[in-house]
Amino acid sequence: MTVLIHVLGSDIPHHNRTVLRFFNDALAATSEHAREFMVVGKDDGLSDSCPALSVQFFPGKKSLAEAAIAKAKANRQQRFFFHGQFNPKLWLALLSGGIKPSQFFWHIWGADLYELSSGLRYKLFYPLRRLAQKRVGCVFATRGDLSFFAKTHPKVRGELLYFPTRMDPSLNTMANDRQREGKMTILVGNSGDRSNDHIAALCAVHQQLGDTVKVVVPMGYPPNNEAYIEEVRQAGLELFSEENLQILSEKLEFDAYLALLRQCDLGYFIFARQQGIGTLCLLIQAGIPCVLNRENPFWQDMTEQHLPVLFTTDDLNEDIVREAQRQLASVDKNTIAFFSPNYLQGWQRALAIAAGEVA
């Protein structure tokens, strides 16, 4: 049987590194279909830190796509597992037959599914991508994204799968010793990416709660984002006093990020799509409820796991937040499907499906 090839077709260092390390540590030892990768980006020590994997790096999207298409044409039994799919040339190859549906398996990351960019080239490309998506052999995604995808592509097979968020299961009870009282601290957004719509989120928090809370905005990723960070800072200072606004412009190490989250009482995410599942997982693990946009279908996954969900359209005050905290504290976090290690079973099944080992 031909070994499955995994494709990270865009240079997204943080996510790509997370996927590679997860496969190296959790999957490669038990499945030959978890070892072969094609990745856009620089090695930057990844080969050394993932010795169980065979990783081929490419300088750009085009060169990777050309190599993948050549492999697909040379051997029609070759199957590919695309993790996120932000590579237009690969979509066009699926649409034109360069890669066959039986060769194309896609794990939706969220941003690669939705059509939110307003640029002309995106608006021209979206209809073509939509046509190509009808030809995918199988999609893997969160419950909410599967529901969203099925509305336009009901005939494409869908399987539940969660991004392998880096988590320490021993911390599932870490919120139990935390006393929450006094001024609330609210985390706004999951990164410095513009998709977080930080300014609108800050306005929404201020409209609901005024300058009575502290807002923390993590913007250390992506790099070279200084102009936008300053734009958010100035807008924030028009709403909140300096002592109540904390803009984090430096990327935090994982342990420092966990410590930051533990200081928060609420996460506030205004984006109208599924994204930031890693931050959501870490907040929930710490006993911190989240406010989501109703257009973000991840609320379906949260309610399926009996987790409290607040919406941006709901009334928001301290009593409501404290009640959500109490509800979250009563949940057995060891049973949450999108937590580590529970998502591992989904990955093992996904590998078997993509490799053709199970129907």
Curated annotation (Swiss-Prot):
One of its GO terms (cellular component) is plasma membrane. It is found in: Cell inner membrane. Its main location: membrane. InterPro entries: WecF. It comes from the Bacteria. It catalyses: beta-D-ManNAcA-(1->4)-alpha-D-GlcNAc-di-trans,octa-cis-undecaprenyl diphosphate + dTDP-4-acetamido-4,6-dideoxy-alpha-D-galactose = alpha-D-FucNAc4-(1->4)-beta-D-ManNAcA-(1->4)-D-GlcNAc-undecaprenyl diphosphate + dTDP + H(+). It is a peripheral membrane protein. One of its GO terms (molecular function) is fucosyltransferase activity. Keywords: Cell inner membrane, Cell membrane, Glycosyltransferase, Membrane, Transferase. Belongs to the glycosyltransferase 56 family. NCBIfam families: PRK02797.1-1 (NF002752), PRK02797.1-2 (NF002753), PRK02797.1-3 (NF002754). Catalyzes the synthesis of Und-PP-GlcNAc-ManNAcA-Fuc4NAc (Lipid III), the third lipid-linked intermediate involved in ECA synthesis. This is TDP-N-acetylfucosamine:lipid II N-acetylfucosaminyltransferase. The gene is wecF.
